[in-house]
Amino acid sequence: MRVKTGVVRRRRHKKVLKLARGFYSGRRKHFRKAKEQLERSMYYAFRDRKQKKRKFRSLWVVRINAACRMHETSYSRFMHALKVANIELDRKVLADMAMNDMQAFKSVLESVKEHL
């Protein structure tokens, strides 16, 4: 018995074209180009979700280092002193303190000063 793909194909095409909304030109309107672009965009999304974590961590390190250098110390010495002093603040919190609450960051720096 012959099976035709009319309904299945239409649903599959609609699903791909719906996900391709916002793409430019034929990449939005033509199924084959939309499918190719969608595969590429899904690859980029997967890859960049991993890279996002790395980029934010490096941004936090840069911000903490800048705040440390304002108080005559380096990032590596500061982080080592935190570990020795058994203060468990992560880089995200420290970077936020360095940007928005310099007094709190300075108090943390003073509390680890003896371990520098």
UniProtKB/Swiss-Prot annotation:
Keywords assigned: Ribonucleoprotein, Ribosomal protein, RNA-binding, rRNA-binding
Cellular component per GO, a single term: ribosome
SUPFAM superfamilies attached to this UniProt entry: Ribosomal protein L20
Any one GO biological process: translation
UniProt-recorded Gene Ontology molecular function terms: rRNA binding; structural constituent of ribosome
Pfam families associated with the record: Ribosomal_L20
Keyword Ribosomal protein belongs to the record: yes
Residue stretches spanning the membrane: none
Xref: InterPro entries: Ribosomal_bL20, RIBOSOMAL_L20_CS, Ribosomal_protein_bL20_C
Xref: CDD domains: Ribosomal_L20
Functional summary from the UniProt entry: Binds directly to 23S ribosomal RNA and is necessary for the in vitro assembly process of the 50S ribosomal subunit. It is not involved in the protein synthesizing functions of that subunit.
Family, as annotated: Belongs to the bacterial ribosomal protein bL20 family.
NCBIfam families in the cross-refs: rplT_bact (TIGR01032)
Name of the molecule in the record: Large ribosomal subunit protein bL20
Gene: rplT
